[in-house]
Amino acid sequence: MKVAVLGAGAWGTALAAHLAARHDTLLWARDAALVAELAARRENVRYLDGVALPPALRYEADLTAALSHAQADDALCVIAAPVAGLRALCRAMRDAGRVPAHFVWVCKGFEADTRLLPHQMVAEELPDHASYGVLSGPSFAREVAQGLPVALTVASASAACRGRTLAAFHHGAMRIYTGDDVVGVEVGGAVKNVLAIATGIADGLGLGLNARAALVTRGLAEMSRLGVALGGRAETFTGLTGLGDLILTATGDLSRNRTVGLQLAAGRSLDDILAALGHVAEGVRCARAVLSIARERGVDMPITEAVCAVLFDGVAPRDAVSGLLRRDAKAE
């Protein structure tokens, strides 16, 4: 199978490395210097240092050429850009007349200005296309690139897209599950990043494992309430893309969003944290959108409110936690 991966960050590189073990895989980056470095060193020093990339993986800086590689009905395109870049890539595909027959995206979050989920952006930009979906689940790029076991879910209204994605990814140490609850999968992927900041704050303050368990459990309830309000199915949030992704992101030391919380608890400013991180922390990007949508829909999300208060309103992390503890008692 021919596969094009658009985006050579850590996640795009890791997925391309996995795909190249079985398929004719092309990894695209708009930065020609990065493409040249990848081809020469067989390592993504910038985003995934220390991981050797397979000799079969090829690299491309020309978007039209990369899209042409994945045009056939038996091919697949994987969009590995962050949420902020998804709409632009869809427009570029449309304008080039090179929309792949089947494609999936792997970004998580809401678009900042419109508060739209990824599938809504795609539908706006490519209204005549149908075979697309989201690939998501509990996964750190470095572990995938190292060939360690991982389980992901592809969600799409298109059986053809689900089948093509399954055929591309389901091999080696990667297990793929399929479904059609695109909204549920996307909401889980967005909200868990915000909740991971909360658990990072709690851990950074030394509040203990009991507090972490409470935050994960009550955070899952917040995620489920919002997801169902937006049209997702409740059972999706107890699966890989809900509870699974939340556990990993909230507790794993490779989690960028958890790292943000830990550093906030240590007294560092958000600007300094993000500058030192050097990578996207989607929980920071979409926290406002999550809270705004929740308020609009009448969904109670106190943990998300506390995270936003720390991120954007200057509330001290310990004061935000105290506010949560002072909430009135209620039935679970």
Curated annotation (Swiss-Prot):
It comes from the Bacteria. PROSITE patterns: NAD_G3PDH. This is Glycerol-3-phosphate dehydrogenase [NAD(P)+]. The keyword Lipid metabolism applies. InterPro entries: 6-PGluconate_DH-like_C_sf, 6PGD_dom2, G3P_DH_NAD-dep, G3P_DH_NAD-dep_C, G3P_DH_NAD-dep_N, NAD(P)-bd_dom_sf. Sn-glycerol 3-phosphate binds at K108, G137, S139, K192, D245, S255, R256, N257. Pathway: Membrane lipid metabolism; glycerophospholipid metabolism. Catalyzes the reduction of the glycolytic intermediate dihydroxyacetone phosphate (DHAP) to sn-glycerol 3-phosphate (G3P), the key precursor for phospholipid synthesis. GO terms for biological process: carbohydrate metabolic process; glycerol-3-phosphate biosynthetic process; glycerol-3-phosphate catabolic process; glycerophospholipid metabolic process; phospholipid biosynthetic process. SUPFAM superfamilies: 6-phosphogluconate dehydrogenase C-terminal domain-like, NAD(P)-binding Rossmann-fold domains. NADPH binds at W11, R30, K108, A141, R256, V280, E282. Keywords: Cytoplasm, Lipid biosynthesis, Lipid metabolism, NAD, NADP, Nucleotide-binding, Oxidoreductase, Phospholipid biosynthesis, Phospholipid metabolism. It is found in: Cytoplasm. One of its GO terms (molecular function) is NAD binding. Belongs to the NAD-dependent glycerol-3-phosphate dehydrogenase family. It comes from Burkholderia thailandensis (strain ATCC 700388 / DSM 13276 / CCUG 48851 / CIP 106301 / E264). Coiled coil: none annotated. One of its GO terms (cellular component) is cytosol. It catalyses: sn-glycerol 3-phosphate + NAD(+) = dihydroxyacetone phosphate + NADH + H(+); sn-glycerol 3-phosphate + NADP(+) = dihydroxyacetone phosphate + NADPH + H(+). Its EC number is 1.1.1.94. Pfam families: NAD_Gly3P_dh_C, NAD_Gly3P_dh_N. It is an enzyme of class 1 (oxidoreductase). Gene3D superfamilies: N-(1-d-carboxylethyl)-l-norvaline Dehydrogenase, domain 2, NAD(P)-binding Rossmann-like Domain. The active site is at K192 (proton acceptor).
